[in-house]
Amino acid sequence: MTRRYWNIDLE
């Protein structure tokens, strides 16, 4: 799950 919603890959 990376660029699906926001910067969820960074959270």
UniProtKB/Swiss-Prot annotation:
<keyword id="KW-0687">Ribonucleoprotein</keyword>
<keyword id="KW-0689">Ribosomal protein</keyword>
<keyword id="KW-0934">Plastid</keyword>
<protein>
    <recommendedName>
        <fullName>Small ribosomal subunit protein uS2c</fullName>
    </recommendedName>
</protein>
<dbReference type="GO" id="GO:1990904">
    <property type="term" value="C:ribonucleoprotein complex"/>
</dbReference>
<dbReference type="GO" id="GO:0005840">
    <property type="term" value="C:ribosome"/>
</dbReference>
<comment type="similarity">
    <text>Belongs to the universal ribosomal protein uS2 family.</text>
</comment>
<dbReference type="GO" id="GO:0009536">
    <property type="term" value="C:plastid"/>
</dbReference>
